[in-house]
């Protein structure tokens, strides 16, 4: 009896199953065996498969899972569909983890707040993914108290902050801008990470007199933009914000 040859979709499904039912797009491209694929752009083929196959569903941008294991995967992520609280918690941890991974590739020391160390990122605790949950002693105590609440910070080799990231899924963007205002004396980048639908709100809240000193320094990054850089980590120097 001859074994049926697996097509490309079958291979992607098998990899997802072997990975526990889910994988990032980046991980799929690392694990799938492309040796028998008659294409010069296998990554594009994988993207088409995950987007079009009814066997696969999107958990978040860049993160895909098997429909047959939906319940198991969502339980692992502590993610309940149509539950805003669990969606907020998962989304926050997911993008914190992605920013940590990008930071590490850029040879930055990565930090997330101690109160976030037990948040999940692809089945792992953020405290096990980031370099530290204890903020380096780079300034006065009153400055550190403000800085240590920032969602993700990258530090350079001198342990000075190079980039501050705040993830705004549903919370008030003004609170993050206020943090950045207090940290403006550092030679660092300031980033709001959110869904593209919040760009107009970001602009409205940034361009007020209070935030004039930082309005040209704060950038808005969409979830898709962050994931796009993560998926091209080997080309990260070509994918700067």
Describe these PLM feature segments.
Residues 75-113:
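Nuclease catalytic cores
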Residues 83-88, 104, 112-159, 231-241:
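Active-site metal-binding core of divalent-cation-utilizing nuclease and nuclease-like domains
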Residues 130, 136-150, 156-222:
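Catalytic cores of nucleic-acid endonucleases
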Residues 1-9, 19, 35-82:
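Charged low-complexity interaction tracts in eukaryotic proteins
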Residues 16-24:
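Short capping segments at the starts of secondary-structure elements
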Residues 10-14, 98:
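Pre-recognition alpha-helix immediately N-terminal to the DNA-recognition helix
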Residues 27-32:
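A short acidic, leucine-rich amphipathic alpha-helix
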Residues 210-241:
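Charged, structured surface patches that assemble and position nucleic-acid processing machinery
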């Amino acid at each position: 009896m001859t074994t049926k040859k697996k097509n490309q979709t079958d291979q992607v499904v098998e990899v997802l199953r072997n990975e526990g039912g889910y994988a990032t797009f980046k991980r799929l491209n690392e694990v799938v065996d492309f040796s028998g694929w008659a294409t010069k752009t296998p990554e594009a083929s994988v993207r088409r498969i995950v987007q079009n196959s009814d066997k696969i569903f999107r958990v978040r941008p860049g993160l895909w899972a098997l429909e047959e294991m939906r319940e198991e995967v969502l339980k692992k992520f502590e993610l309940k569909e149509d539950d805003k609280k669990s969606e907020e918690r998962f989304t926050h941890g997911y993008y914190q983890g992605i920013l940590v991974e990008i930071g590490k590739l850029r040879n930055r020391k990565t930090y997330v707040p101690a109160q976030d160390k037990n948040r999940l990122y692809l089945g792992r605790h953020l405290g096990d993914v980031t370099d530290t949950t204890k903020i380096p002693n780079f300034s006065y105590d009153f400055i550190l108290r403000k800085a240590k609440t920032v969602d993700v910070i990258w530090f350079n080799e001198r342990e000075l902050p190079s980039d501050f990231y705040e993830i705004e899924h549903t919370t008030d963007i003004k609170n993050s801008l206020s943090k950045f205002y207090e940290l403006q004396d550092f030679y660092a980048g300031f980033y709001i990470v959110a869904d593209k639908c919040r760009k107009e709100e970001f602009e409205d809240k940034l361009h007020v007199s209070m935030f004039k000193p930082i309005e040209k320094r704060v950038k808005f990054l969409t979830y898709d933009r962050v994931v796009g850089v993560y998926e091209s980590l080997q080309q990260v120097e070509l994918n700067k914000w």
